[in-house]
Every structure is written in structure tokens, then in C-alpha cells.
Amino acid sequence: MKFSKMHGNGNDFIVIEDLNNEYLGKEGEIAQKMCHRRFGIGADGILIVRKNENCDIEMVIINSDGSYAAMCGNGIRCFAKYVYEKGIVKKDVLDVLTGDGVKRIFLEIENDKVKTINVNMGFGDFKPKNIPALCDEEIIEKKVSVGNGNFEITSLLMGVPHTIIFEEEKYPIECGRDIEKYELFPQGTNVNFCKVIDRNTMEVRTWERGAGPTLACGTGNCASVIAANKLGLVDKEVKVIVPGGELKVNIEDDGVKMIGNASFICDGTYLF
């Protein structure tokens, strides 16, 4: 099985082409084996490239534990760079079908290489039934006791569920494990620990549902900026600093724009 390994701000993925649906139904098993950091290649998840009649291309995301993910911000940047530079879709504006619908992506090209990727991530959704969360009112600075800690949480759907915690002092990232599985969230939640530096800068650390601590999470960065803006903590153009680097998130009338890059690590053959 041919593959490429890529990363977006340290959030790493294995990209495989399945243009003839050869691996349909085997995605979870493939992801668990390939993503294992001792017995496999090692990654936070896999990105599967598939044809689609209604779009330029389709992206399927599987987490390292074999679970399906509707959307991944860092993953879609890697995916867009891959399909352009591998010659699968040679367009600087492309529509990618994801589990969260079609995402329009604008590529900045220099010497036939993708320099910057601008993704319209759509809008955040605070409706509890859509997150989903087992409550009637929006989760805005809700006080909860989870595990051994007390937190104020804000939750929304950004393609996948995200819970935001604004911290004055750093919580251990492992707190995310208990919050991910908190009874309020029947399907679990990603957890983002945020610190506002100024009105145009934030730091974000993410515990990713199904993957654990990660160096970056694109949907989490977008969700964090949306939550911070809703609470009046930041403006609409924000630089987000994560352990693996930084990117820009802009809140615009037609959706939230995530602007960053992605990198190839290696190509290879996996003996599946």
C-alpha cells in the first residue's frame, strides 16, 4: 500500500489513495495498524483520497483509534496539498467533500508547490442538539465538575464537537481525557485549553477525541476563536499559537477562514 506521511503544525497524518474504493469497509482496521507509533508508521489519523462525482475530490478521515471523524482542519490542509502536488486535482480553488459537507479551499501556488492553504470552515453551531449535548440551553461558560477538577466550559460544533476552556493557569492536558467522556456529551468531545494573549492572539492546546494530546487541531483552533469572539475576548482576525506552530483564523460573513500550511514528511510502502 503506497502512502505519504504529512503534517499540519505537527498534527500528523498518513494519506492513502483509494480511487477505486479498494479499502472500503476496512478503514478502521487500516487506521489502527498504520497509526500505531510502535508497530506501525505512527500518526494521529489517516486521510483517504476518493473520487466523487459531485465534487473535485472526497476526503475520508479516520482517527488513530479507528473511529470516523467528520472533519479535521489540519487534515484538510494536508489533503489539499497532497491532491494538488500529486496531480490528482490540479486546481488552485477546489471543493472537497467531507463528512461535514463541502469545503471550498483556496491554494496559493508558488513554483507549482502549495505555499498557503485557505479553507472556508463554515460556521460554528452552539445548538446543543447538534453538538450533540444533553441539555436544552447553549453551553456558554457553564460550570461543571469533571474528574478531580472544576471547569467553565463553552461548547459548539465545528464539524466535530469542541469544548473550550479559558484558563488563567495551565490545566494538565490530561484533564481532557475526563472532559472528552463527560456525561453531557453522548458522542464525546474534543477539548481545547485556551489562553488569550491579546485581542488578536491566542494560545490553544487540544486534547483530541479519539487521539489524545495533539500538537495542533484546526477545527479546535477555529472553535476556540469563535468562542472567544462570542465572549468578547478577541476580534475577528486572530493568530492562534499551538505547540506545533501557528495559523490564522478569520471570522468573515461567509464563514470562518483557516489559513495555514502543510508539509510532506515522507512517501513509502506499507505492508498491510
From Swiss-Prot:
EC number assigned by the record: 5.1.1.7
GO biological process, one term: lysine biosynthetic process via diaminopimelate
Catalytic residues as annotated in Swiss-Prot or TrEMBL: C72 (proton donor), C217 (proton acceptor)
Site (Could be important to modulate the pK values of the two catalytic cysteine residues): H162, E208
Pathway(s) per entry: Amino-acid biosynthesis; L-lysine biosynthesis via DAP pathway; DL-2,6-diaminopimelate from LL-2,6-diaminopimelate: step 1/1
Record's GO cellular component terms: cytosol
Compartment annotation: Cytoplasm
Signal peptide boundaries: none
Primary location: cytoplasm
Pfam families: DAP_epimerase
Keywords of this entry: Amino-acid biosynthesis, Cytoplasm, Isomerase, Lysine biosynthesis
One GO MF term attached to the UniProt entry: diaminopimelate epimerase activity
Biological role stated in the UniProt entry: Catalyzes the stereoinversion of LL-2,6-diaminopimelate (L,L-DAP) to meso-diaminopimelate (meso-DAP), a precursor of L-lysine and an essential component of the bacterial peptidoglycan.
Family assignment from sequence similarity: Belongs to the diaminopimelate epimerase family.
Record's subunit section: Homodimer.
NCBIfam families on file: DapF
Protein name (database record): Diaminopimelate epimerase
Name of the gene encoding the protein in the UniProt record: dapF
